[in-house]
Amino acid sequence: MEGWLGNLLAKSVKDKYIPVIVGRRDLWNKVFTPKSVNPDDNYEALEIVGDGVASYFFPSYFLKRFPQLNSPKGVKTVARLKIYYGSKKSFSSIADSLGFWKFIRSGPVPVNPSTRESLLEDTFEAFLGAVCMAVDDEYSIDGLGAVVAYKIMADIFDDMDISLEYTALFDTVTRLKELMDVKKDVLGGDAVYNHRGDTTVITLKGRVIGKATGAIKRDRAKEAAGQALDLLRREGHFREHDDDAVVKVAKGPAGDGLVVAQSALGGFTVFGAESGVVEGSGGTVAQALSRVVGTKRPSAVEVAGGDYKSLLKEYLESVGETDSVNYIHEGVTVTMTRKGKPVATANHLVKKVREQLASRDYYRTVHAKGV
């Protein structure tokens, strides 16, 4: 564990702190021990400390990364970012992508996807708490450990492509509910979800407006809600979001391979023209550009070792399928579905890389089996 932990900390933590943190074996034994394994000596206390650090981190970080949100209109978006990226799904995905799972002591409790997610989330928060406690204890400076933990989280989130758009921050189920609330008088009813077996059907006044199949109820609901939103939009029913449409892209070059997006709230965000990855942001174009990392990041295709999304699309078209694959993103995890059924997952901080990695894994499977 010491080698893994040292490598994990090396990117974000000053050299002098690393042995202080890694050397606290008493804390790390707790970090990876849930209450179900040891009711008296587990991660619960550290988890509370880590949760407090995360609660401070998110609003502070997002206001620094997106200065345009430092306004009355931006408060709602900051709150939503905090909810979305501080969720169980987000923290568990981060912990999983960093390799936490192999160290967690699950004990006699059966592990299913839900308990696995909870264990990963709790452990990540306990990890932050352990960093705080180790540094504070060594230097007898209250709060110094929180500064170190903040830097770790900042480096994790700096590598994420974070969108401020309404459709990225709110899932389809939430957006459909909001549409129903706003347009209730026009639509004359509520969207009703009917779950039977592996199928979810959404009806509005008895009319089917969305349908999806698959093993995971939550994913089915999101896919069916997406169909419902598309259908209602085609029929002229959609919610106008002047206040929520935070980013409005103004196409145009702003340096080598970069595009500037102007916010409705007055700031600017710089994206990679091809990758779509957020490279920098600020109150002015100059400030946003000054924060762009100088080194070129590998593209999603380069990370995956090929354009597997295109290869998979060509393969499916050759067997008579079009538009049968969807990508459902939760935090740093993507679930690929084919005809509504989950077929592959991948973890990565960058959305396009996640999709290429999932496509690669599934392409290799179907190409080998010919299914």
From Swiss-Prot:
One of its GO terms (biological process) is RNA processing. GO terms for molecular function: ribonuclease III activity; RNA binding. Its EC number is 3.1.26.3. It catalyses: Endonucleolytic cleavage to 5'-phosphomonoester. Digests double-stranded RNA. Belongs to the IIV-6 142R family. This is Putative ribonuclease 3.
